[in-house]
Amino acid sequence: MGRQWNVLFDVVTSTYASFPYSPYMDAYKPELGMAAGARTNNALKYTLATPDRKWVGTLQYSFGEKNNTSSVANMALPALGAATGGQLTGGSNLNQGIVAPVGPGGSLVQVNTVKGVIDGAVANAANDPNPNALKNAVEDVGMGAMKTFGGFLRYSANGLSLGAGAMRTTLPGGSDLDAYTLGGSYRTGPWYFNAGYGLNKYKAVGTGTTSGSYINYLVDRQILNKMWSGQTNGGFSGGYFENAATKRQMIKLGFGYQATKQLNLGAHFFRAKQSGSSDGTYNGNANFMVLAADYAFSKRTDAYAAIDYTKVSGGKGLNLDVASQARSRTGITIGLRHRF
């Protein structure tokens, strides 16, 4: 029991990994963005296998341990309440008007709504490239224990490996993320071929009618966005508000070739489709390509190099960088690794 790789990560890396000779070599791993965070806290795992290990199956369960959004609400609501002269509290109706003195006479005029104030604070925090209190509070909740249940089944024989996995994650605010993956690989001589499919379906808790319930919704949405938009996962956003995407699919194809005893080469292509955005802002596609080479100097020391390319298209909310709004990116990785 403890912080462990989840069953989705296990089945992908053990059955149809992008770079099987060293699945942790390259930091560019779009398929791991479909693995619900890849690691799970407070996890229990139970594995069964046939004596020849042709069949392997694992079940996983983790405890939520009262991880909830109250820390974010306790931090955000007093600050927003002070900024609005005490007009915003945890029980405030989302449509309630926020008034302020306007003009020479100081007449009170509605300048915003409770929902508008919260949305503005979230947007400012999300678009700020630097750490800030609101993002840090949400990230602390996201790093806490969440309730999960899932499993995987794998078959391997004569160079062929097939596997499938599924897992449900209940987020702190009450939303559910259902994640599925299936795929396979085949080895023959120096060649390795792999293909896989991943699906994430997000079932959001309702926005409710009060600021407190709306914060639950927004925190869950941000945690999902963190899983989806990390740079190692491809790095494109699913959105933050009611027009956010709720479904992401990905296919991958690739091959590896062991050119010599020391030199391994690989090329992989991934295509993702994002949908569910109510106004289309976050609906679209993403293509990922990566070429990599690894040279082993010894059993414990190797050098590697990779070049990757990412391009997104579709709704105006799809981009790879908040500041520049870039829709394409090229990355180069070079490294030397020694295992102690």
Show where each model-derived region lies:
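Outer membrane beta-barrel
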Residues: M1-K66, R154-N158
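Transmembrane beta-strands of outer-membrane beta-barrel proteins
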Residues: G2-Q4, T58-S62, G163-M167, N194-G198, ...
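Structural signature of outer-membrane beta-barrel domains
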Residues: N6-D10, G64-N68, N158, T169-L171, ...
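Outer-membrane beta-barrel and related beta-rich outer-membrane complex signature
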Residues: V11-A17, T69-A73, V205-T209, D279, ...
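Extracytoplasmic loops and strand-loop junctions of Gram-negative outer membrane beta-barrel proteins
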Residues: D26-P30, N132-A137, Q231-G239, Q274-G276, ...
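Loop-centered beta-sheet repeat module
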Residues: L59-A82, G86, N93-V99, D128-D176
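Detector for outer-membrane/organellar transmembrane beta-barrel domains
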Residues: N112, V117, E139-F288
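Outer-membrane beta-barrel "beta-signal"
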Residues: Y295-F297, A326-F340
